[in-house]
């Protein structure tokens, strides 16, 4: 649980010239007495491509902090234009207002800042060299991005490593995306299982068809064998009959009959 809660920030001189100081009225609540001061700091992001151009505009120690709701005015100098890449001086950038306790940052507020020329002529036809005196800034104060960090306070035992390093404001969205991805994966696995079952059923059907076909082939083979055996038996019977007929014919030619042979 955070001992210090940020209640509100009001951006005072906005819009303003690029060379004007920054002014913020900050309201926060302290739930318990603090042993150390709070450190507030304002950082200007000079380039979106490198951290080397970031400038710490100012920092202030607030303390001792009484329990309850507190309010103070924070002023910071403007950034040095010579430390900002010329291609990014007249553009959109970010300022970061952060607060730390015992060198541990627990809240950070980011604002978009739009830097542009103060006349339509310069905006349509910007000079080759940036004219800083004609550049104005506009802080999008109505759309701050707040990030909170869990730290160990005076009344808490333990190590800071036991706490998650930070809690992003988009944590819920990331969890929803992860849940959606898991659901998609489960659906894909179910589809694969269904396809696998259908494939197995198809294979079983093919095997059954093959077994049935083989069975019918074997049955037809057995029928053919039986027919061949019957034909052979019929042929043998016909041959025996022909032989008997031939013998009877021979005996008839000799004038003998089976009866005559018996009598003689």
UniProtKB/Swiss-Prot annotation:
Chain intervals for the UniProt region annotation (Disordered): 152-264
Task of the protein: Histone chaperone that facilitates histone deposition and histone exchange and removal during nucleosome assembly and disassembly.
Gene name for this UniProt entry: ASF1
Molecular function per GO: acetyltransferase activator activity; histone binding
Record-linked InterPro entries: ASF1-like (IPR006818), ASF1-like_sf (IPR036747), Hist_deposition_Asf1 (IPR017282)
Keywords from the UniProt entry: Chaperone, Chromatin regulator, Coiled coil, Nucleus, Transcription, Transcription regulation
Native source species: Debaryomyces hansenii (strain ATCC 36239 / CBS 767 / BCRC 21394 / JCM 1990 / NBRC 0083 / IGC 2968) (Yeast)
Pfam families: ASF1_hist_chap
Main location: nucleus
Residue ranges the record marks as coiled coil: 165-198, 231-251
Source taxon at top rank: Eukaryota
Quaternary assembly: Interacts with histone H3 and histone H4.
Family designation: Belongs to the ASF1 family.
GO cellular component: chromosome, telomeric region; cytosol; H3 histone acetyltransferase complex; nucleus
Comp. bias (Acidic residues): 154-213, 223-248
UniProt-listed GO biological process terms: cellular response to stress; DNA replication-dependent chromatin assembly; nucleosome assembly; nucleosome disassembly; positive regulation of transcription elongation by RNA polymerase II; protein modification process; silent mating-type cassette heterochromatin formation; subtelomeric heterochromatin formation
Protein name: Histone chaperone ASF1
Location in or out of the cell: Nucleus
């Amino acid at each position: 649980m955070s001992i210090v809660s940020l209640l509100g920030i009001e951006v005072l001189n906005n819009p303003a010239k690029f060379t004007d100081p920054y002014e913020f009225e900050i309201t926060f609540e302290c739930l318990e007495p603090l042993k150390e001061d709070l450190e507030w700091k304002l950082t200007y992001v000079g380039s979106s491509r490198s951290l080397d151009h970031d400038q710490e505009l100012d920092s202030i120690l607030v303390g001792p902090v009484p329990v309850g709701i507190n309010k103070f005015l924070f002023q910071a100098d403007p950034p040095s234009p010579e430390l900002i890449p010329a291609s990014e001086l007249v553009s959109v950038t970010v300022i970061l207002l952060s607060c730390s306790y015992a060198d541990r940052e627990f809240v950070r507020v980011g604002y978009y800042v739009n830097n542009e020329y103060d006349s339509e002529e310069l905006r349509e036809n910007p000079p080759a060299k940036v004219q800083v005196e004609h550049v104005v800034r506009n802080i999008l104060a109505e759309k701050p991005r707040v990030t909170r960090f869990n730290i160990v306070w005076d009344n808490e035992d333990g190590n800071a490593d036991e706490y998650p390093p930070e809690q992003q404001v988009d944590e819920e969205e990331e969890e929803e995306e992860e849940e959606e991805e898991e659901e998609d994966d489960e659906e894909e696995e179910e589809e694969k299982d269904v396809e696998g079952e259908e494939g197995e059923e198809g294979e079983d059907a093919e095997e059954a068809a093959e077994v049935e076909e083989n069975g019918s082939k074997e049955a037809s083979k057995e029928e053919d064998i039986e027919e061949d055996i019957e034909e052979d038996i019929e042929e043998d019977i016909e041959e025996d009959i022909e032989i008997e007929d031939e013998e009877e014919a021979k005996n008839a030619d000799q004038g003998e009959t089976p009866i005559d042979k018996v009598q003689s």
